[in-house]
Amino acid sequence: MAEAAAASTAASGVIGGWTKHVTCRYFMHGLCKEGDNCRYSHDLTNSKPAAMICKFFQKGNCVFGDRCRFEHCKPAKNEELPAPQMLPLPSASLAGPSDPEPSGPTPVPGAQDWVNAAEFVPGQPYCGRAEQAKVESSVPLIEEFDSYPAPDNKQLRKQLCPYAAVGECRYGINCAYLHGDVCYMCGLQVLHPTDNNQRSEHTKACIEAHEKDMEISFAIQRSKDMMCGVCMEVVFEKANPSERRFGILSNCSHCYCLKCIRKWRSAKQFESKIIKSCPECRITSNFVIPSEYWVEDKDDKQKLIQKYKDGMGSKPCRYFDEGRGTCPFGSNCFYKHAFPDGRLEEAQPQRRQTGSNSRNRNSRRTPLWDIYDERESTDSFDNEDEEMVTFELSEMLLMLLAAGTDDEEVIIRPPSCATSSGRLDPTVTRYRKAC
């Protein structure tokens, strides 16, 4: 048995290794979830217990009470921090002579000071919990945080109090700084009594901010009931906040949300002229302007378009790619065409050249919508090329008749079916191969 115990002790020593000589810090604090299986030592005879003092008990409130695993003891007197030295503000000379301090202990504000707090009256300076009337010396005190000399009282009286400027100063009339006049626009004490320039600048800034807020209010009022013409939902009431944006068409005044109109214009099964037109009135708009609010007035829309173009003009064009690529929109592109050295692309003059059909062709890059419009407006068959097209169609007909089956039906669209607008007549000529 003795040999087995010695073997187990040796095995445990090998398993634990050097950690068995280190006291478990969790066990020292009274909590180790490993128990007997812990790799560290649970022997407190050779270890100094940790002095873990409960900081909540020192503050007077520990919810664990006797069950707290930290030590409940008050700090020694030599460990208490010295009280900060109190110095009067530079406005002490304005407060008059002070009475001698009482010999008894000075009452420290406790948790019941809120009972005697000053009543808050709208439009009046809020004094907070400062008991100015009970201060024996009638002088506000501040803690000495640094050794820099205090500024002159005359200099302080020329500066506006930063606390009164936001609506609250605990020192009231005893403040060393100057309390400005109340601005009738913002209701804050930010107007300097003697500086007319500061008063005029602040009043101007307040009026501009007020006008901007009113414009936003009118825009919200104008936009809150607008319904998208595609999804038939109120834009401001969409479930996803990111979808509460309008897609303003440049040449149309119909209302659409940005998601729906972009989806409409990204369709691939229709021609460009169709997808670029309004779904309701069919007026073509070359671009869509994202907007947080609905804009219908002509002047406001022009301002929005110009703001949109200015914003796009500050972003580099990914097609131009600093001169390495080619942008299909050319000089009409909204994005910035700049080279790596910062130079902007110069607008290239349009060069005209005459083709075989006596039509002017533009050799310069043309915007995509102009390309589509030119393609739609161009006749599919020209008069001078009609004989050549007829000959080619005849050859195609002969090839189909030679390679087709007995029951095969061949549909041919001859040049005579072309209308004056360049589109083919829906009626076609049908040929059936004879047996």
Curated annotation (Swiss-Prot):
An example Gene Ontology molecular-function term: zinc ion binding
Tissues/organs with expression: Weakly expressed in adult brain, heart and kidney.
Positions of region (Disordered): 81-109, 345-369
UniProt biased composition (Pro residues): 99-108
Zinc finger (RING-type): 228-282
Gene Ontology BP term (one): protein polyubiquitination
Keyword terms: Metal-binding, Repeat, Transferase, Ubl conjugation pathway, Zinc, Zinc-finger
Listed EC numbers: 2.3.2.27
Function: E3 ubiquitin ligase catalyzing the covalent attachment of ubiquitin moieties onto substrate proteins.
Protein name in the entry: Probable E3 ubiquitin-protein ligase makorin-1
Organism: Seriola quinqueradiata
